[in-house]
Design a protein with these regions (language model features):
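Extended, regular secondary-structure scaffolds
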Residues: 236-287, 291, 295
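Active-site loops and adjacent core secondary-structure elements that bind or stabilize anionic groups
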Residues: 7, 36-212, 216-223
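Cys/His-coordinated zinc-binding microdomains
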Residues: 21
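Extended, well-ordered protein cores
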Residues: 190, 197-214, 230-232, 264, ...
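Gly/Pro-rich turn-and-neighbor structural signature
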Residues: 202-224, 228-232, 238, 245-249, ...
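Short metal-coordination and nucleic-acid-contact micro-motifs, chiefly zinc-binding Cys/His arrays
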Residues: 13-16, 25, 31
């Protein structure tokens, strides 16, 4: 591993992201994301993942911690998925929150012999932005190792998103919580073995399924079993709100708050299944699905 400053300078990169299928040239976005993410946001997300790995190491060393730390880990990973949060200021606040949480645990438990990700601390924005450039994807030089680490990381991001949605509905799987933290720490190892990373990828898939099962249980027990449903794809004349994503808890709150207001609710993309849940059908305000709006908006 080495810092990315020289790599960026030599290759004329100001960022590097290749986590989605739309990435530039099917290789990676190096100046601005195809999604619209700029280099400051991309680098801040890299730093958030880095300090979250550090927090994970600390949590693992302690063994038993308050569930709020696992929630913070999952939420941080969720923040970095494509189109979830492009607010650099908000991401840097989460970096600072994570550093404070990590430092508090280290001090209270007198932890030693930690990695740089666990020890790293700063409340200076300029220093945080400098560090962000050092800890990105390309910091792993070996391409096979890098690819497997990132494959695992992206699996953890999806797992964390489903885990977060289940958590807000009051459902939790401690094995999933601990797997996310333990696996994030494993990606920090300098002496990574390719076969171990392949096995870790398979374990990530297994636990990803567990997270999906947890979210399915949460959604069906709270909103009912999905039913075959005819969905309207037309648009009306009323003011409207467009909602995407997977958070049915947000959908319920939105439907309740907009009830009898004359405001229509349009689902988009991943939120299409909201139309199938029995509990949402009690609202007079019908859900309408928009297949391809010009932009994604998430509540």
């Amino acid at each position: 591993s080495r810092g990315l400053g020289d790599v960026y300078k030599r290759q004329d990169f100001i960022m590097f992201c290749f986590q989605c299928q739309e990435t530039a040239g099917n290789k990676g976005c190096t100046k601005v994301g195809v999604c619209g993410k700029n280099e400051n946001t991309a680098n801040s997300q890299d730093l958030l993942i880095y300090v979250t790995k550090g927090l994970s190491e600390v949590v693992n060393k302690i063994g038993e911690v308050d569930s709020k730390y696992y929630d913070l880990i999952s939420n941080n990973m969720f923040v970095t998925i494509t189109n979830a949060n492009f607010d650099e200021e908000d991401i840097l606040r989460k970096v600072e929150e994570t550093i404070k949480a990590k430092d508090k645990l280290i001090k209270e438990n007198k932890l030693e012999d930690l990695s740089d990700a666990a020890k790293y601390t700063s409340d200076d924005r300029n220093e945080l932005k400098r560090k962000a450039i050092e800890v990105g994807v390309l910091n792993i030089i070996n391409e096979d190792e890098r690819s497997l680490v990132e494959l695992v990381t992206y699996g953890l991001k999806g797992m964390a998103a489903y885990n977060h949605h289940a958590n807000v509905l009051g459902y939790r799987n401690e094995e999933v919580d601990k797997f996310i933290a333990q696996t994030l720490e494993k990606t920090l190892k300098d002496d990574k073995d390719i076969n171990d990373l392949i096995n870790l990828t398979m374990e990530t898939g297994k636990h990803g399924l567990m997270a999906m099962e947890l979210l399915d249980k949460a959604n069906t027990e709270k909103f009912g079993n999905p039913e075959i449903t005819e969905v309207d794809f037309s648009a009306g004349d009323n003011p409207a709100i467009l909602i995407s994503g997977h958070d049915l808890n947000d959908m319920e709150m939105l439907l309740e708050q907009s009830k009898d207001s004359g405001v229509d609710i349009y689902t988009h993309s991943e939120m299409l299944p909201a139309n199938y849940y029995p509990k949402f059908k009690k609202y007079d305000l019908s859900l309408i699905h928009i297949s391809e709006p010009t932009r994604h908006w998430a509540i």
